[in-house]
Design a protein with these regions (language model features):
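Chalcogenol-based redox active-site neighborhoods
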Residues: 1-220
Length: 220
């Protein structure tokens, strides 16, 4: 069964390029992004892993840990990293999980429970559903799920934008409108009454409709 927003992220132990981890312990009190790819040494994923390495400092600034996953063994990840650095200018600077028995991919709903457990015999096409992005909060719950086809590279700048929104709305009773970026106006959450809103926003708000109350972004 696919994971839904607010589900608890399944915990697991796994070998990674940076040693063995238990996922929930590894997250600690941080946010996390787990992103998966169907096979090492594939073209689109090569560009994705390189770009993620390039912008990882932006995730660091937001207190977000990054971890990748594929069904290939960890030693394959290490070899692939050389190609990624050569072609993209950046080598992965975050751990990569080797899900060789497919157990994590199954637990996270990326592969069916009946999938063949021998990863070495599986092709990228067999694993094409293993192209997900999950954002996990400090409470270990799923905050975002994105699924991409093999032919479409992921937009990690959009993941950063969503994390900005998630972190802001976790602290303040607001929502972010279409195409919102950090620093732009936000919407007072519908669960907040006008009376409560007046206490939080004594300068008032713009309201083109009673249900659409617009205010400057609160300071963190």
């Amino acid at each position: 069964m696919s994971l839904q927003i607010n589900d608890v992220a399944p915990d697991f132990e796994a070998e990674t390029t940076e040693g063995r981890i238990r996922f929930h312990d590894w997250i600690g009190d941080s946010w996390a992004v787990l992103f998966s790819h169907p096979k090492d040494f594939t073209p689109v994923c090569t560009t994705e892993l390189g770009y993620m390495a390039r912008i990882k400092s932006e995730f660091d600034k937001r207190g977000v840990k990054i971890i990748g996953l594929s069904v290939d063994p960890v030693d394959n990840h290490a070899k692939w990293a050389l190609d990624i650095e050569e072609t993209q200018g950046f080598a992965p600077n975050y751990p990569m999980i080797g899900d060789t028995d497919l157990q994590i991919s199954k637990a996270w709903g990326m592969l069916p429970a009946a999938a063949n457990g021998d990863a070495s015999k599986r092709t990228a096409s067999d694993n094409q559903t293993v192209r997900n992005v999950f954002v996990v909060g400090p409470d270990k719950k799923i905050k975002l799920v994105l699924v991409y086809p093999m032919t479409t590279g992921r937009n990690f700048d959009e993941v950063l934008r969503v994390i900005d929104s998630l972190q802001l709305t976790a602290k303040h009773k607001v929502a972010t409108p279409v195409n919102w970026k950090h620093g732009e106006d936000v919407i007072i959450a519908g669960s907040v009454s006008d009376e409560d809103a007046k206490r939080t926003y004594p300068k008032g708000w713009k309201a083109p409709k009673p249900y659409l109350r617009i205010v400057p972004q609160p300071r963190s």
